[in-house]
């Protein structure tokens, strides 16, 4: 008698191997930090363990289109002092990727105009490596929360706080962390009363002295920042900052050493890395975009601090992580003043993650390699539910 139609014994049937978790690496975006985000994505795609994870690279163009892109990390590096662009990597100039709209179904769909949408399969976790507005500021995180898709890094509130330097400093102050003097010029102030806005800054300089740093309130990677030595350069600095954000922040220059510390979420809670020191770049007025990414000004890892100073900056970095309700990872930036006091400058909820970035270097020196860092972040996201937590 033929047995081909008889029920199989489940214990004797060949079992389908478990599906590997699928990670969508989302990068690019509409902010001024588009190119650095692409470089970061290239580093993550090169480091992620393909034996453990399936990977889906999704780039967001400068005009906001979600595109399927080539999985070719070697094309995502800085070349000839130029950062790459999602449009150069996109598989189509018109097609778009659609996220799930039902939390019970995590299937991602690709759609071309005039064609039947194509299912790309389920995504288990999103690794967003976007920097700046429309990606690092809580907007993307809110979209993923609505879709019910787990994601790497800070949630909606922490991302928003970490992006807006004014509210970040307010949160730190309320939790007892020391911040430097600053002033804020909101869009309406500059647009309706420029003389009043200028007077506000001049009065601030009169109290705290020149030079000042004028910067976008909601941007990173040192983009749009100008060091202003006197009143003559003020208007130009304001307009440069406003090219990136209509709201600007003015900070007093602090004399001291620039110290950074990484925070990473482990199973038992956040831990701090060994700190790093950013020496004054010889060819730049301060640690600007060119020094960070183009000329690769090297940091000192670990920072030459005393044991007591190291322990204190690590404590403060974790305190900043907790104050902003962060998750996943943070880089906390401090000044160690001439009075031997740590003043927190800012946190980055998605810090620079390129091979030359300080965050991976600090964790490498702490015993966590770049591939392990990527793996820990993905695993933390897989453990964490979306929604209120």
Curated annotation (Swiss-Prot):
Q: Which GO terms describe its biological process?
A: cell wall organization; peptidoglycan biosynthetic process; regulation of cell shape
Report one GO cellular component.
Answer: cytosol
Keywords for this entry? ATP-binding, Cell shape, Cell wall biogenesis/degradation, Cytoplasm, Ligase, Magnesium, Manganese, Metal-binding, Nucleotide-binding, Peptidoglycan synthesis
ATP-grasp domain location, by residue?
Answer: 169-379
The subcellular localization recorded is: Cytoplasm
Q: In which pathway does it act?
A: Cell wall biogenesis; peptidoglycan biosynthesis
List positions binding ATP: 205-260
Biased-composition ranges, Polar residues, are 1-12
Give the PROSITE patterns listed for this entry: ATP_GRASP, DALA_DALA_LIGASE_1, DALA_DALA_LIGASE_2
Spell out the InterPro entries in the cross-references.
ATP-grasp (IPR011761), ATP_grasp_subdomain_1 (IPR013815), D-Ala_lig_Van_CS (IPR000291), D_ala_D_ala (IPR005905), Dala_Dala_lig_C (IPR011095), Dala_Dala_lig_N (IPR011127), PreATP-grasp_dom_sf (IPR016185)
One GO MF term attached to the UniProt entry: ATP binding
Indicate yes or no for the key word Metal-binding.
Answer: yes
User: What task does this protein carry out?
Assistant: Cell wall formation.
User: Hey, which family's this protein in?
Assistant: Belongs to the D-alanine--D-alanine ligase family.
Q: What's the name of the protein?
A: D-alanine--D-alanine ligase
Q: What is the lineage of its organism?
A: Bacteria, Bacillati, Actinomycetota, Actinomycetes, Kitasatosporales
């Amino acid at each position: 008698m033929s047995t081909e139609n008889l029920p199989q014994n489940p214990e004797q049937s060949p079992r389908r191997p478990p599906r590997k978790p699928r990670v969508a690496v989302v990068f690019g975006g509409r902010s001024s930090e588009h190119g650095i985000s692409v470089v970061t994505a290239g580093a993550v795609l090169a480091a992620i363990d393909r034996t453990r994870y399936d990977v889906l690279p999704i780039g967001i163009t400068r005009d906001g289109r979600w595109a399927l892109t080539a999985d070719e990390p070697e094309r995502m590096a800085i070349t000839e002092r130029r950062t790459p662009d999602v449009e150069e990597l996109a598989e189509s100039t018109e097609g778009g990727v659609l996220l799930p709209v039902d939390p019970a179904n995590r299937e991602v769909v690709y759609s071309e105009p005039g064609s039947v949408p194509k299912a790309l399969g389920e995504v288990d976790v999103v690794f967003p490596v976007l920097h700046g507005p429309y990606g690092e500021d809580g907007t993307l995180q809110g979209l993923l929360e609505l879709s019910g898709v787990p994601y790497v890094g800070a949630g909606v509130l922490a991302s928003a706080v970490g992006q807006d330097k004014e509210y970040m400093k307010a949160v730190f102050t309320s939790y007892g962390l020391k911040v430097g003097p600053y002033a804020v010029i909101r869009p309406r102030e500059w647009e309706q009363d420029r003389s009043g806005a200028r007077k506000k800054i001049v009065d601030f300089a009169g109290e705290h002295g020149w030079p000042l740093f004028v910067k976008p309130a909601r941007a990173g990677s040192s983009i749009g920042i100008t060091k202003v030595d006197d009143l003559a350069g003020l208007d130009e600095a304001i307009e440069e900052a406003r090219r990136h954000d209509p709201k600007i922040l003015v900070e007093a220059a602090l004399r001291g050493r620039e110290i950074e510390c990484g925070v990473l979420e482990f199973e038992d809670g956040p831990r701090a890395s060994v700190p790093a020191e950013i020496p004054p770049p010889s060819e730049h007025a301060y640690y600007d975009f060119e020094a960070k990414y183009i000329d690769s000004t090297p940091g000192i890892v670990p920072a030459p601090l005393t044991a007591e100073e190291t322990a204190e900056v690590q404590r403060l970095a974790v305190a900043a992580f907790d104050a902003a309700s962060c998750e996943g990872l943070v880089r906390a930036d401090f000044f160690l003043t001439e009075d031997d006091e740590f003043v927190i400058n800012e946190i980055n909820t998605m810090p620079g993650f390129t091979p030359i970035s300080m965050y991976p270097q600090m964790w490498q020196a702490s015993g966590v390699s770049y591939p392990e860092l990527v793996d820990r972040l993905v695993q933390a996201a897989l453990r964490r539910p979306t929604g209120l937590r």
